[in-house]
Amino acid sequence: MIARILYFFLWSAAFLPELQCASQRTADALTTFPTSAFINGTDRKDSNQTSTSRIKRKTLSVDFAVPSLLRYYLALFIKRPLNGDCLSFNGCYTVRANLLMRCVPLQKTIAGLLDAKLAAMNVNRSSTGQLPYRQKRPVPKVLNLGLTSASRKSNQVVVEVGEEMVKTGCGGLHVYEDAPVVFLEMDLTRILEWWLGAEGGRLRVRLMPERKVQVPGKEDKYSAAIRASDARLFIQIASSERPSSTISRNPTVAPKYWNFSWIAEDELTFPEDPVSTSDCTSKAKSCDRRPDGYYPEFAWSLTSAEDSWAIDQTMVKTKASSQGWEEGRFLTVNSSALTGPWVLSPWFRAAHRPCGLDITVFLHPRQSGRYTVWLIERDKPPLALLTTEHPHVIGWAVVHLSLAARSKPFRISSSYSQPGEIETATYDPRYSTNCTTRSSQNVTLRGRYHCRGGREINVSQLCDFSIDCPQGDDEGEHCRQFLNGSYCSFGREDCGWQPVQGRGPQWRAHPSIPQSLRSSCPSPGALLAIDSQPKGQRGSAQVRSPLFFYPLRNAPCMVKFWVCGSSNGALSLWITENSTGPEGQRSLWNSTSEANMGKGWKLITLPLFGLVDLFYLQFSADISSSSGIAFAVDNFTLSMECFLETNGEFPPVAPISPTQALFTQSNENIKTTTTLYGGPGASTESVKWIFHTCGATGQDGPTPTQCSNSYRNTNVNVTVGTKGPFKGIQMWQVPETRKYRITAYGAAGGRSVLAVHKSHGVYMTGDFLLQKDELLYILVGQEGEDACPNMVPTMDRICREQQGPSINKTQLKGGGGGGGGGTYVFKVVNGVHIPLLIAAGGGGRGYSSQSETPEEVMDRDPSIPGRNGKSGTAGGGGGWNDSAPVPQGGRPLILGGQGGEPCQAMGWKTRGGFGGGGGACTAGGGGGGYRGGSAWHDNDPRKDGDDGTSYISPDGEMYLEPLKGMEGNGEVIINPVQNCSHCESGDCHETSEGMVCYCDEELTLAPDGVSCINSTELPLLPAQPSLSHLALGLSVGTSALIAALLLAVSGVMIMYRRKHTELQSIQLELQSPDCKLSKLRASTIMTDYNPNYCFGGKTASVNDLKEVPRRNISLTRGLGHGAFGEVYEGLAVGIPGEPSPMQVAVKTLPEVCSEQDELDFLMEALIISKFSHQNIVRCIGVSLQALPHFILLELMAGGDLKSFLRETRPRLEHPSSLTMVDLLNIARDIARGCQYLEENQFIHRDIAARNCLLTCKGPGRVAKIGDFGMARDIYRASYYRKGGRAMLPVKWMPPEAFMEGIFTSKTDTWSFGVLLWEIFSLGYMPYPSRSNQEVLEFVTNGGRMDPPKNCPGPVYRIMTQSWQHQPEDRPNFSTILERIDYCLQDPDVVNVPLPVEYGPIPEEEERVPMRPEDPSAPSLLVSPQGTEDVPSATHSAQSKKDGEAIHMANLSTDSKLPPVPPSQPHPHHHLQTPVVTAPVPASKPSSTTSNAQDGGHVNLGFMQAHSSEKESRNRKPTNLWNPTYGSWFLQQQQKRQQVQAQRQTSGPRIPGEGQEQVGRTVTVAEALGLQQQHKQQQYQQQLQRQQQQQQQQQQQQGLCRPLLPPPPPPAPTPLLLDSATLAPVPLYRLRRFPCGNIGYGYQEQGLPMEPMQGPQLPPPHPGQQRPISLTRASGPEDSRPLLVTMGTVQDSRLPKMEGHNATVL
């Protein structure tokens, strides 16, 4: 326990702003000092400090950024948008995102900043009084983060880290050393889901301290702890891999499986302590570490703290400063039970001047660990600046570091190795530095691909023509379909690569290798090739790629391709960005730089960094007529790193260098192909270092970034100079002392117009003894620039036509080749350059070169001055040590070695290569070397530039003499000299089998592997044995394998046929009406599905439903057909908590239905059962133990709201009892129900008058929400998004719902606004005279409905507020209820009279156009005619009795109507007037005829139609009003008699609400007005009929009293009811209606409706004109869906929707 307390106190010292004592001081000194925020003794924050803190918070946060282009490229790869639409794109995908932070730094930082007394008394008590040692350890929780409206606008999530977050996520503030909580985890899945489907910029996640710690002293430490917590952002997006019922042959179909993950983190890791070699342990002893050849970058000294404070008074002032954070002070503390404590600084910069750093540590002789201070740069491994050995003194020591100026940002890390458990380390937080601070940098984003078999690979291994996944899902068609041309094997197509038209040979995609390349480039497949076998073809042939998208910013993008061809030709790859055009074309690669070009296929990998615009690539082949030249390119790829990875704010860098292997852990998933020097157990015997130009071309050398990228995944680690004479020179540190073999290759000279061959550079090899840590300087020569091909059209024409030099004197200033640069290997000792090995560069070729190849020249005497070559019009080559030459001359190495300029800027950009190459004119430029080559003085086009001279130091031993043979850029190869003393020749080389001795020519290695013998002395080899037995074995094995495969295939086919037959029989059995689906039993449902859903935070399942025994339920009469089956009125007894008997409405599910119908039926029961509100229809119980299944609902005698509003409209002859207060009360009831749903986070999605029910029609009525048909499918997926081809109520939906499929509680707000419009228009259809398509365009363009007639202004304002375009601008239902209450209290609102209806009665509004037998024939709207009798001999008696007539369409005088069979008996009587259909020829134009004598008012704005209750040909009922109770018809004998009497006495009626058409409304209006006498008679009849109806309703309903059971029958009714005790009910209808096949007021195109059974039609009277009402031949809109997507899908399980409110999305 004492050790724990001591450990805590010492750690507290690392966090507190003041530390005045060591661990051995008294307890008085252990009290903490006040922070800088409370120096003045008050808790009030200074406004200036707060303002400063807010500014600094921007620089102290950790910043994660996910580029928006990543979202685009991922969607392009998977061939589907990332919008959560699961139905349109063959399945969903899963998303996961979380943020991890280490808990220990956060816990210790926050605990150290709490109240000092509490911290001293309770060790680690939190601010809330938590005692971690005495109470049970809290359980850490995963924190869920959401998006605010501000975050949605900025695509930025700000995570404020504070005390409460750490307590919750880490389980308290105490660190349990035995089992610490490692990570604080935050779930960002919802944020990622939103961002993937949204638009806008990148997703940004920023970590910063919470606002209440804005005191500068506290905020600094919080920010430091956040940085030290090593935050990491994990993202994973994967396909759900759901099986598809159909197999698509479309190649552009999205891949079935894909799984990507990313991790965003700072790649810097903190190293372990190496074995220290420092011996500076004495007090006040100064030590300097200055390796040979290094500029002193740092120095450090170790002094006592007392002496330092006594001398430096500024540090004392810093200690007492009250400014909190200052430039020059930092502290970041992190600790782990596994790795020990360490501190980390922010990013610093010392760009212009050196800076210093003071670190205070506590030393004790008993410490076995060591303090180590590291210098960390992003592009380099951590460098140990100092390491303390076992100290011999006790006390505080100040370590002072002096850092040289550095161009790149860096950090300082100090760590302490902790061998023992009781080891402690103490740091004084008073670090001081004058280095400039930098803000935190963005982190990198690295991607991984998860194979189907579970293996993970890097993104770079995806789509690279190399199968790395076990099942091969990392390659294939989805890679080829990603970006055209980026993944091409030139097999089936050219992938968009097009040849550039020109003379000479052309690039072509060949199905097989050309004849000229078959011997050297064997290939079984197709490829892109060029062949110049026909004589006389010469010039340049280009092939160009498609235009590629630019990669992500700072992406590690690579281009890879395989190439094979002739060694005497030239193939190059160029890149052109769209913004620069052909003038900015850059060369990426040239085949002349590749060794062994003509010896098989070679894989070329090139970096593509820094691209910010669209670009294309171009292969260019230079063809001469001297010999046949052929090239082939295959398997071209752009790495997926280009589009799925980014390096953050930094350009791509080389991987961790070999020396850093001491500090970082190895990754088993990274495959290496070379053995890196510097790791544990590594040996230099087999290591080879290859240095090249890093991709640089021309007269200037490479940059550090180029070399970092070029040496990626290699064992080469160099530093590249950026200033002065060392610019472009590579510096390499010798790993150990031994003899090395150095091979230097000079660069070749450039080609001229007529000379197609380069002047070769010189290569030579020497052995040198090098010392460990010695710095070797390497300048790799670059080839001189070629005159051809040329980007200038005029010059390029000269190149193609091979013109001579005398055509134009102004163009003679050029055409020669630039001189090649020499390759230099040298050392710098005490500022003096010492050459070791110099390989000369080749001279440039003259315009029409006729020079002979010169011999190699080498210098060995260092006393010979290394002068520049002589320059004429063309420049001479640069030497070793000379003065500055003319501009066209190459510069000597001492001055930088840059190449010379061309003689004149006439478009001949033939500069000398880096390494002293001379610039060309008509004559060639001189080559670089120890002594530069001279150029011809009179610019003779026939003269080449001279080669430079080579050199080897006397300290070296020549191994290979100079030889001209390099036809490209230079190169340097360094490898350790092998110990070949055991070989007779003294020479050997290493192979995979070990060391192999060399032998001279005509000698052969003896069998002993050591000596060399004459090849003629070798004994004859014994004859090889016959291979007949091997061939026989192979043939037998092959035959057996083929036979096994045939048997296996046959077995599979037989099993498949058997299974197919069984499936067919099962399907036939399932389709049989006598089949009882056993899966629909309750036990099977629970086993297969067991649906569990969440309602308002509560989990619900089928077990929660109240089961009512079937014997307690009796059905009395039918109410109609619902969404699943018949709906009945019944009685239920024995239900706990309910009256007995109780009137209920029973919804049934037929026995023969699908599993999905069963699940939908249970879903609706679950939804309704979990709601308990006075304005929502109550579920009494269910009966699932027997078939058919029942749902028992409370009986609503008032019917649906829409029908009630239509029936009670005030009319001129019949005033209504409704008032404005009644309408407001109905609206308030529905709003209360919606508020309840909103509070329980439930989305109804279909708030409309047809889905609301009334308890009664008289006063005291209560409105309730009664249909949840559209709400039940929101629980089948994880997203509140309606997708696929579903029927949607467009006129009740906001724009985001029908455009994007997004449903929220604000969707119901919009629908409630439309419901208000329905209520105050008294049941009219919204958006009058507009079709669904017109409504889509109208609402999307900002249009809204006008207020209904006599609608009060405050009510219309509620509507308009509910119709706001932005969902967040719409009010919630609490606000809507308040506004409705205000309206009820406003006299100006409640006293507004209702509008008077002048149209027809509701029964006549419900007429529906019936479809004829011919689908192309127009539908007829049929209405009754009571007063006008049409004479006909074919009328039936029933037709005459009912007094009905038919309004016929006068389309043609020759049209004849076929007879219709008489009406069939129906088990239920309906209130609808019988209608008939008649086919009408569709070829004739529709015409309209108005009858002025009929009179009446035609409301063209609100024309409606409803289907009849009959069944159509496909067994789909054509009239369904409300799916909760079905069709509301009441078998009231008095009302039927009244209707019959009305038909006999009423006059002709014209429908008041017509039919909306698809695309546009075609209505036929009758003439307005009747004769006055006929009108008065009609009014009187209607008034009498209305009075009779009022009396009957009052007698039947009274004042809306509670529902009571009907009078008992004469026989006594038993308490336990049974269906047998009541009158028989036609229950056969439960089997007649198949589950789910319910029509919704429409028919599919081409499926005519069943003709209605009615009286036979009479022939038209000659000359008689009849009123007509026509619709289009294609059918009304309610008889077919509006097609938004191609194809028509009618879902039989969708909820019923009335009128024209359905569309297919």
UniProtKB/Swiss-Prot annotation:
Phenotype on deletion? Morpholino knockdown of the protein causes impaired neuronal differentiation and reduced neuron numbers in the hindbrain. Fishes display normal iridophore development.
Which residue pairs form cystines in this protein? 694-707, 788-799, 903-921, 980-988, 983-997
Q: How does it assemble?
A: Homodimer; homodimerizes upon binding to alkal ligands (alkal1, alkal2a or alkal2b).
Q: Name one Pfam family in it.
A: PK_Tyr_Ser-Thr
Q: Which family does it belong to?
A: Belongs to the protein kinase superfamily. Tyr protein kinase family. Insulin receptor subfamily.
Q: Active site at which residues?
A: 1246 (proton acceptor)
Q: Which UniProt keywords apply?
A: ATP-binding, Cell membrane, Disulfide bond, Glycoprotein, Kinase, Membrane, Nucleotide-binding, Receptor, Signal, Transferase, Transmembrane, Transmembrane helix, Tyrosine-protein kinase
Cite the MAM domain residue spans from the record. 486-644
Free-text activity regulation comment from the record: Inhibited by ALK inhibitor TAE684.
According to its UniProt entry, the protein's GO biological process terms are: cell surface receptor protein tyrosine kinase signaling pathway; positive regulation of MAPK cascade; positive regulation of neurogenesis
Which ranges of this chain reside in the Extracellular compartment per its record?
A: 22-1035
Matches recorded under InterPro entries: ConA-like_dom_sf, Kinase-like_dom_sf, LDrepeatLR_classA_rpt, MAM_dom, Prot_kinase_dom, Protein_kinase_ATP_BS, RTK, Ser-Thr/Tyr_kinase_cat_dom
Q: Write out the ranges of the annotated region (EGF-like).
A: 980-1016
Would I find Cell membrane among this entry's keywords? yes
Protein name (database record): ALK tyrosine kinase receptor
Please state the span of the N-terminal signal peptide per the UniProt entry.
1-21
What this protein is reported to do is described as:
Receptor tyrosine kinase required for neurogenesis in the developing central nervous system. Following activation by alkal ligands (alkal1, alkal2a or alkal2b) at the cell surface, transduces an extracellular signal into an intracellular response. Ligand-binding to the extracellular domain induces tyrosine kinase activation, resulting in the activation of the mitogen-activated protein kinase (MAPK) pathway. Phosphorylates almost exclusively at the first tyrosine of the Y-x-x-x-Y-Y motif.
Question: Where are the membrane-spanning stretches?
Answer: 1036-1056
Q: What is the lineage of its organism?
A: Eukaryota, Metazoa, Chordata, Craniata, Vertebrata
Positions of glycan attachment:
40, 48, 124, 259, 334, 434, 442, 458, 484, 578, 590, 635, 717, 808, 881, 979, 1014
Q: Tell me the segments the record calls region Disordered.
A: 842-892, 1395-1499, 1505-1524, 1532-1557, 1588-1613, 1646-1681
Q: What are the Low complexity biased-composition ranges?
A: 1532-1544, 1588-1602
